[in-house]
Amino acid sequence: MYQIIVSKTAEKFLDKLDSSDRERIIKALERIRVRPERFLEKLVGEKGYKFRVGDYRLFIDLDKGNLMISVIKIGYRKNIYKW
């Protein structure tokens, strides 16, 4: 089972959400801990993956060797792709 690490940026975004959205994202992350490859999509032109949870997108770095899922950034679908 993979370990989940959340960046400070992603944690700040989670703190701003209402409790129902926050819980939905946390439950979704718990669900992908066993086999994350089934749920993640490769980012085009970038390294890493995206994970969809409703209107939110999570940018994730997957370390298969150390069994770690790193949540790099969380944002709304319409805003997250603008760096």
Regions picked out by a protein language model, each given a short descriptive name:
Residues K27-R52:
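A short, surface-exposed loop/turn module that caps and links secondary-structure elements
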Residues L14-L17, L29, L43, L67:
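Generic leucine side-chain signal with a strong bias for well-ordered alpha-helical environments
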Residues M1-I5, K16, S20-E23, V53, ...:
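Enriched for short, Lys/Arg-rich terminal
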Residues L17, R31-R35, F59:
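Histidine kinase transmitter module recognition
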Residues V6-A10:
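Basic, amphipathic "hinge/linker" alpha-helix immediately C-terminal to the N-terminal HTH DNA-binding motif
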